[in-house]
Amino acid sequence: YPTLKEQKANEHLNYINNIFMTYKGGGFSMVSFPEYEYDLKLTPEEENADIAIYVLARNSGEGMDRRLIKGDALLTDTEIKDILYLNNKFKKFMLVLNVGGVVDLTPVKLVSNILLLSQLGVVTGDILANIILGKQNPSGKLTTTWASIPDYKFLKEFGSLDDTNYVEGVYVGYRYFDSVGVKPLYPFGYGLSYTSFDISKVSLTNEKDEIKIKVKVKNEGDFYGKEVVQVYVSPSQENVDKPYQSLVAFAKTPKIEKAKEVEMTLNFKLRNVARYDEKKANYILDKGNYIIRVGNSSDCTKVFGYIELTEDVITEDLKNINSNPDFEDFKPEVIYKDNLKNVQKIKLTKNDFTIKKVEYSYECKTQKEIENLDNKELAKLCIGNYIDRKTEGSLGMGTGFAGQTTKYVEEIKNTLIMADGPAGLRVSKVYGIDYRGYHKLSPSTLLMNDYSFYEIQGKITLEKDYSEKESSFSDYRKIVHQYATALPIATAIAQSFNVEFGKLCGDIVGKEMKVFNIHLWLAPGMNIHRHILCGRNFEYFSEDPLVSGKMAAALTLGVQKYKNKGVTLKHFTGNNQEFNRLNSNSKMSERALREIYLKGFQIAIEEAH
């Protein structure tokens, strides 16, 4: 009896702990894909087929992180068995990855034809069909390193209930792998197509610290296509440890026909490679050589030249804003050396730079309407149009959005309507209108034979025929259906490495914001792909701050083409796990904060303000 009593007590304690952990995590349930045990038996017709396609799917979402288990970040035994069987059976076999994040493909790395389809919204099926049929040529590149699970050194520094220690410092993603010499399965910036390209140097020039690189990109294959030119800089190794290389510029070519070539010019400022000195609270370029590498992935570059900096240069004076964590950042032991003989050199001194001094001002200007509000009215203003019933939506044409500023303060005549959505606007698909206002409804409760189509202001709307004798939903004078476009996830947009495509996606959102009377889109997400298990990595662009900032700016510019339509760059900042996100404490050095986690926000704001 004592043993049984102790067992039951432990079970009850575990039950309570699970409830506590779920509550603290504050998330939604994320399930791994189940493993089905079966034998893959092909019919005679299938045996004689020319090609086989296997689609691997994964999901994730807000509130909970992914897990290091089979069916999530790992392949199941059945998936491995089936993929390898089909790969050996069919000469033409394609593994399609319909995923929003990294999956460890080590067990199937022998498969030579893998398509990262990602999650592309309404066009997903069309794109897959066009690629299979050869009507379109994929040209994307990875914005996150895909590696074997054992090669991720800092796996344990993730998912803690309270404190999360960013001990990797600035060595995030490819900055870590390249610096320690670990070869991932698929490096940052990597991506194949139905053709191949050669990138050669035309010229390397400068105007003070702005470096200009002209390249020639030639299509050497038998199919038209596009290439992504990527420029990396390996910084001086003087004084302080630094990543082996960092992306400083990228550009997508236009479509290049076979045997044709194009010239492109990319530029960057050397000041953007400066490291942050925590002791002196400034950005500094250490004297030494800065090597310029150009290629089509972080793992495939050529040295095009180098910059010789004759002295230390302070590029920006700031002040520290972060408290020191109780740990030391990771430092690699590798020292990098390149043979720079017969390589073009550009010589710079501190006279080629201007020191940026930041003036801090805490003056806050408010509208006159705000100045006259009392504390109660200010409180209402802060919490927005809060109603303690989830069935109620925001007022206006588009009910059921993420929120609305308050209508309960008489002095505030105008309100802002906001819509969530990581891949386009999230709106209620159906809502009802009666004498009380607007109400969110569930489509499953509506009987379609009670509705008719009406044309209002040139738009077709599905409305409920009103009758006082009707029961159930008879109170609603009108039922309105509305749908927004499902766009590619942020990671997929970034993998295009095409800022014009980013602007186009933003344009779609901005246009629909105008239709639905939405003022602010609660996107794009700016957080870094610090860890492959973050449940919302699909909402974010990349492990690299330059890609994140550039693509966020592109989306923002697309939205802001429309008057009074805007975005909210989120989540500011260091929100890199979902578990216990409302209570967790992200601890990092000032250097990591500024060089990695704030950099994307800075780029987006500066380029899209």
Model regions and ranges:
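Short beta-strand edge segments in extracellular beta-sheet folds
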Residues: Y306-E316
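Extracellular/periplasmic metallocenter environments
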Residues: A281
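Glycoside hydrolase catalytic-domain context in secreted enzymes
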Residues: Y1-R275, I284-C300, T315-H609
